[in-house]
Design a protein with these regions (language model features):
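An acidic-aromatic
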Residues: 98-149
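N-terminal leader/targeting segments and the immediate start of mature chains
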Residues: 19-74, 80-84, 270-272
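Edge/loop elements at the starts and ends of beta-strands within beta-rich repeat scaffolds
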Residues: 61-69, 80-85, 92-93, 172, ...
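Bacterial N-terminal signal peptides that target proteins for export
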Residues: 1-7
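C-terminal motif of bacterial Sec signal peptides marking the signal peptidase cleavage site
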Residues: 14-17
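Gly/Pro-enriched, hydrophobic low-complexity segments
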Residues: 20-24, 169-272
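Post-signal peptide N-terminal segment of secreted/secretory-pathway proteins
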Residues: 70-113, 119-120
């Protein structure tokens, strides 16, 4: 696998690295109903429930909204051995329909093009002239999680992932509010700013205590040039038996522009 292929996988590798060792189950649909269990500390107060409800609703209201989204992203990947890979990702998304991704190297030569829909994952390896087509279950095979188009779009747009509406507790610290939720796969400690209500970080701990793995995502350098609070710099840090770090630096981005999603298969490409 060439370096650009590795860079593409790096965009979802944190999910792979902290995947639970269990069979995939269908994720229940997200609803607006909030199931709240407040961990009692002394005498529970009604204010605790109110604070959790208010901040959960603010997180949901603060999600990036779009019909189409496109961005130019500098991707930096560093593995446990200190090996670094740098690439530029050109990303286009049509909500709930398609993810289109093109990865280029330092010389501006395109190496990988991806086309992901609800049903399929298609990859063009332009360096080795190989075409790969798989069902969308390929995402689940790679990550061993119920990852689908919608959750991958949320990840790329900067929305919370694996954040369950059943919140077990909250905490206040240094101007931040942290909400703790327990889902089918992860315990998610999600932190937002008390003042700006922007998503600051998400700490995902695997429920499988036999093989503890942690993913830490940060959302930095917010700006509101397009009418939405958008994190232009993000980091993904994975700690398992080995460690890896990913940095995503959004150089350009736009919402709701007319986009094309070109993906044609040259006749001389081998099918994988």
């Amino acid at each position: 696998m060439n370096q650009l292929s590795v860079s593409f996988i790096a965009l979802i590798i944190f999910l792979y690295a902290c995947r639970p060792a269990r069979n995939i189950q269908t994720t229940p649909p997200v609803t607006d109903t909030i199931a709240i269990t407040v961990t009692p500390t002394g005498n529970p107060k009604e204010d605790s429930i109110r604070i959790i409800k208010e901040n959960y609703n603010r997180i949901i209201a603060g999600r990036i909204q779009y019909n189409t989204f496109n961005a130019k992203i500098d991707v930096e990947y560093k593995d446990a051995d200190g090996k670094e890979i740098n690439a530029t990702a050109h990303l286009r998304m049509y909500k709930d329909s398609v993810i289109w991704l093109s990865l280029t190297g330092p010389l501006g030569i395109e190496g990988i093009r991806a086309y992901i829909t609800k049903d399929s994952v298609k990859l063009l390896n332009k360096q080795d002239k190989i075409y790969t087509a798989r069902s969308v279950s390929y995402l689940q095979d790679v990550t061993e999680l119920p990852l689908d188009l919608a959750s991958l779009q949320n990840l790329l747009a900067g929305n919370p992932v694996f954040f369950d509406s059943t919140i077990t507790s909250y905490s206040l610290s240094q101007g931040n509010i942290s909400l703790l939720s327990t889902g089918d796969f992860f315990i998610n400690l999600l932190t937002i700013g008390d003042a700006d209500k922007n998503l600051h970080s998400s700490k995902l701990d695997d429920l499988d205590t036999a093989r503890p793995r942690t993913c830490y995502l940060t959302y930095l350098d917010y700006e509101n040039k397009k009418g939405q609070n958008f994190s232009t710099r993000r980091t993904v840090n994975v700690t398992d038996k080995k460690k890896l770090d990913i940095k995503l630096d959004f150089k350009q981005y736009d919402f709701n522009e007319t986009l094309s999603f070109p993906f044609s298969i040259p006749k001389n490409y081998k099918r994988n």
